[in-house]
């Protein structure tokens, strides 16, 4: 796997394994220079598009994704030094105990919560691109502390807090040792710093990250290729499963606002999205097959675009978080559609 992808946070809906399939039907940057990513998510598609030389305009309503866009897509030269990591541990008069009060020991251990309360105060005080890089490091740190990135697993964190090693799942104990979960936070932060720095590069383009509602974003940008990866109907909504992470990142308890794509009829929200996308001459759409089958999706896209290529791939996002039955029937639907620029 391309080593720059390690800079990104692990994301349940990530497209790292599908990058070659997504890009194989697309015109090169010399023919279609501007790549628009309307649902940035974990950032793998935008980072790959940047590496290929497209000018990337990416967007996501979630702050966790916007952090990725600012730190790795928009940023083309600023990296983190060892001193930046050291400053995360310095006492800060604006430090609160928000994370320790609300998220230990259910989400992270008390020791890690105290570090994170200090680290977030220092990261938010940083200036310019360094702020986004440090916030990305802390997002990756939190996800690294979670069993397979799963925020629903409280028992294991309670066992770590109490030192009940013999009672713990041995698979997680091995994983925890591999990821140095019990080590000093600075050692983990140094590993994450190096990962993030490897993802910072220039492609000679002026790339931009936005944090907007998708329909507002689509009205305001122009481009040649539009990548659409909306939340899949019938699956766990990110805003619910990542509520704890979003709250920690915001510094306050947030209540999830369900996406229009996660509730209601899937075809209605998709049709509205496609209608708002008609100005773009090339679409790439990725979607899950939980509620919408490939044939239905093709018919819907054909209402707006004359040339449609459709493929279906067996795809598992996180093996440890899905049943054998789910892995067997799960498919990633991929559509490339072409029309005329309007």
Predicted regions and their residues:
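Class I S-adenosyl-L-methionine
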Residues: 295-342
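S-adenosyl-L-methionine
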Residues: 1-39, 44-51, 75, 136, ...
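Conserved S-adenosyl-L-methionine
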Residues: 31-87
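Mobile active-site "lid"/loop adjacent to the S-adenosyl-L-methionine
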Residues: 231-268
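SAM-dependent nucleic-acid methyltransferase catalytic core
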Residues: 107-226, 233-241, 252-254
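Conserved phosphoryl-transfer catalytic core
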Residues: 69-125
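Conserved Class I SAM-dependent methyltransferase catalytic core
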Residues: 263-313
């Amino acid at each position: 796997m391309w080593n720059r992808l390690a800079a990104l946070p692990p994301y349940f809906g990530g497209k790292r394994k599908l990058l070659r399939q997504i890009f194989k039907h697309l015109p090169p940057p010399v023919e279609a220079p501007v790549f628009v990513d309307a649902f940035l998510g974990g950032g793998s598609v935008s980072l790959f598009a940047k590496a290929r030389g497209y000018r990337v305009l990416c967007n996501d309503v979630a702050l966790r994704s916007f952090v990725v866009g600012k730190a790795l897509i928009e940023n083309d030269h600023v990296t983190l030094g060892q001193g930046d990591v050291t400053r995360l541990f310095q006492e800060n008069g604006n430090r609160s105990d928000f994370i320790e009060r609300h998220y230990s020991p259910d989400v992270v251990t008390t020791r890690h919560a105290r570090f994170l309360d200090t680290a977030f105060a220092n990261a938010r005080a940083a200036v310019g691109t360094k702020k986004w890089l440090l916030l990305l490091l802390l997002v990756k740190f939190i996800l690294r502390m979670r069993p397979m990135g799963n925020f629903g697993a409280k028992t294991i964190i309670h066992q770590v807090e109490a030192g009940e090693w013999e009672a713990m799942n041995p698979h997680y104990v091995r994983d925890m040792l591999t990821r140095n979960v019990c080590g000093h936070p600075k050692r983990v932060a140094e590993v994450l710093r190096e990962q993030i720095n490897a993802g910072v590069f220039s492609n000679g383009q002026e790339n931009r990250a936005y944090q907007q509602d998708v329909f507002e974003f689509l009205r305001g940008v122009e481009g040649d290729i539009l990548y659409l990866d909306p939340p899949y109907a019938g699956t766990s909504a990110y805003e619910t499963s990542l509520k704890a992470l979003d709250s920690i990142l915001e510094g306050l308890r947030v209540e999830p606002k369900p996406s229009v794509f996660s509730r209601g009829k899937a075809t209605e929200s998709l049709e509205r999205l496609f209608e708002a996308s008609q100005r773009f001459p090339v679409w790439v759409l990725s979607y899950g097959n939980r509620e919408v089958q490939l044939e239905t999706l093709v018919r819907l896209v054909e209402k707006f675009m004359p040339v449609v290529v459709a493929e279906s791939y067996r795809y598992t996002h996180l093996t440890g978080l899905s049943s054998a039955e789910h892995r067997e029937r799960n498919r990633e639907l991929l559509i490339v559609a072409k029309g005329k620029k309007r």
